[in-house]
Amino acid sequence: MALADYSYQPGRGIYTDMNALRPDDDVDPIHSVYVDQWDWEKAIRPEDRTLDYLKKTVTEIYSAMKRTAFLLGELYPELEDYLPENITFIHSEDLEAEYPDLDPVEREKRAAKKYGAIFIIGIGYPLSNGKPHGMRAPDYDDWSTENHNGCHGLNGDIIVWDRVRNDSLELSSMGIRVDAEALVRQLDMKGAEERKELYWHKRLLRGDYPETIGGGIGQSRLCMFLLNKAHIGEVQASVWSEEDREEARSKGVYLI
């Protein structure tokens, strides 16, 4: 909406250094009450609503992460850069076909460990069992547009293999946003047709907004990954219970 109201042209956009508190969320080594991320949104042309454009944007973001990891390794040799040179793109539907007996979380782990860095495409579209790889709102990313080989979605997550935690780590969620056609389709799929009467939705449906792409990059998660930390509380100040602190201390981890 802001891109429309401030007349942003294709190729231009906005970003925010977002800080938020989520006191009702569960906390663990990669989730805290305090949330910090770079949220960004860019106006694009209608002809940019393609899988190739999405991949190009993902590659640019990943390249910035890779360069940062390399430079840190040059300055501090103990911070080994083990990110692969290129990110691997995988459709959530292809991932299900490759690992049909695993749940989505385990599929992510298996693929992230195999490739080092992956972008899972089409998160939100129902897989063969009728359930999506992960939940997505119907009025945000376009996860339903068919792209190739019968697969769907113009969105996804950047996920890396974290050697310190021996686990996968999501660093960014992003995608090409819904246009009018995708919005109507996804609201119907989710049984949320009544949202068409909301202010934002009405404006999109009547063509007030430019086509856009956007996402969020987790600041603390990226920092803990680049600095080889095992807990998000090692790179940001947040609120932790004494039980959480004691558990971390027992593993040689001291929370800020």
Predicted regions and their residues:
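Short, flexible, solvent-exposed loop/turn segments with mixed acidic/basic and small polar residues
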Residues: 28-33, 107-109
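Alpha-helical scaffold segments that mediate packing/assembly in large oligomeric complexes
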Residues: 66-104
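Inter-helical turn/loop segments and adjacent helix faces that build the functional surface
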Residues: 44-52
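Extracellular structured ligand-interaction cores
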Residues: 12-14, 35-39, 115-117, 157
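Class II aminoacyl-tRNA synthetase-like tRNA-binding/catalytic domains
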Residues: 1-31, 39-43
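Short, solvent-exposed loop/turn segments at secondary-structure junctions
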Residues: 22-23, 47, 125-126
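Long, well-ordered alpha-helical scaffolding segments within enzyme catalytic domains
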Residues: 52-69
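A translation/RNA-centric and nucleic-acid-associated enzymatic feature enriched
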Residues: 92-256
